[in-house]
Amino acid sequence: MAEPRQEFDTAEDHAEGYALLQDQEGEHGLKASPLQTPADDGPEEPVSETSDAKSTPTAEDVTAPLVDERTPGEQAATQPPTDIPEGTTAEEAGIGDTPNMEDQAAGHVTQARMVSKGKEGTGSEDRKAKGADSKTGTKIATPRGTAPPGQKGTANATRIPAKTTPSPKTPPGTGEPAKSGDRSGYSSPGSPGTPGSRSRTPSLPTPPTREPKKVAVVRTPPKSPSSTKSRLQTAPVPMPDLKNVRSKIGSTENLKHQPGGGKVQIINKKLDLSNVQSKCGSKDNIKHVPGGGSVQIVYKPVDLSKVTSKCGSLGNIHHKPGGGQVEVKSEKLDFKDRVQSKIGSLDNITHVPGGGNKKIETHKLTFRENAKAKTDHGAEIVYKSPVVSGDTSPRHLSNVSSTGSINMVDSPQLATLADEVSASLAKQGL
């Protein structure tokens, strides 16, 4: 469980290192020139020495897998800067035992962590900035004489167990080619070709007056394995070296084994039924034709000339039954001549019953003349016909009669009032 976590940390350190390298190149204007590391002086000397000790190969590093016997100066002089494509091992590229950029970065990361754990009081901002620069950017080897012997021993002491720790998953014989192939997969995600060429160019000595610009390193929190897996999948991963890989349980011993079966051929042959015998001898009567089925239905007319009746009914064949010859005649009846009354009622046919000679007389009712008011108001109502002769005028007539009654002709309002009263009384039946 410790190895996958260490590989994820190195991949993150690679990404941060290339980001810082691009920032330094943009600030110092060194995009077209090879990578240069500023000189370390002042209070930053222990950190620079530690970084030099980390990157300087010594005699004790011969036991480490990826260490060259020559000095880095000789390596830079003898070998020109070449671009090595990703996914190739050191033996295929023809470099020999020269450590590549990814192995140096991985070694720097592990050494820096172990040194920081072993030492106390190394938590200042300058040490963090310088540790980040040595971890990510300074991958160029320096001569052996630059580092003090005391620090060289500590760097080698910390580097040997980090480099020679055997992996429990890979055999010891095939650890270094597999590691170089795996480390080559953790190249820069942006430009995979340029960091290799920069790491193999010799560093030029920088003037001591120029001080490196301190860059604050922001440590990102550790990412989850799912995010790192998604980020690692986007980078071009070379094909792993499967020649020296051994399975855990020996499942590759029968790798070329081909399982049996699968060679069954289904052949369709016609069945030979010539010699087949029936189970119960049913072929003995195979040509038997069952009887029946040959009945012909013939339609012939029935001869009824010689047919005799059952009970001698032909003797009365011409017999006509009686009845049915009744004729309904319509004759006009003469009642006057032939009809007589039952009880002699025609004797009194001219009799006129008594009564019925009364006359209904129609008399005109003189109700208005005889009408009187219910309440006696002391005046007599005299009614006269409204027809008045032309020679007489209303003024000529007296308004009051001799008896003192009011004349209805002179006052039309009283006349209308009397008419209304008489009409209402007539309706009431008085």
Swiss-Prot record:
Residues 1-245, 387-406 are annotated as: Disordered. It comes from Spermophilus citellus. The modification Phosphotyrosine is found at residues 18, 186, 383. Disulfide bonds join 280-311. This is Microtubule-associated protein tau. Polyubiquitinated. Requires functional TRAF6 and may provoke SQSTM1-dependent degradation by the proteasome. One of its GO terms (cellular component) is microtubule. The modification N6,N6-dimethyllysine is found at residues 152, 300. The modification N-acetylalanine is found at residue 2. InterPro entries: MAP2/MAP4/Tau (IPR027324), MAP_tubulin-bd_rpt (IPR001084), Tau (IPR002955). Promotes microtubule assembly and stability, and might be involved in the establishment and maintenance of neuronal polarity. The C-terminus binds axonal microtubules while the N-terminus binds neural plasma membrane components, suggesting that tau functions as a linker protein between both. Axonal polarity is predetermined by tau localization (in the neuronal cell) in the domain of the cell body defined by the centrosome. The short isoforms allow plasticity of the cytoskeleton whereas the longer isoforms may preferentially play a role in its stabilization. The modification Omega-N-methylarginine is found at residues 144, 338. It is found in: Cytoplasm, Cytosol; Cell membrane; Cytoplasm, Cytoskeleton; Cell projection, Axon. GO terms for biological process: hibernation; microtubule cytoskeleton organization; neuron projection development. Transmembrane segments: none annotated.
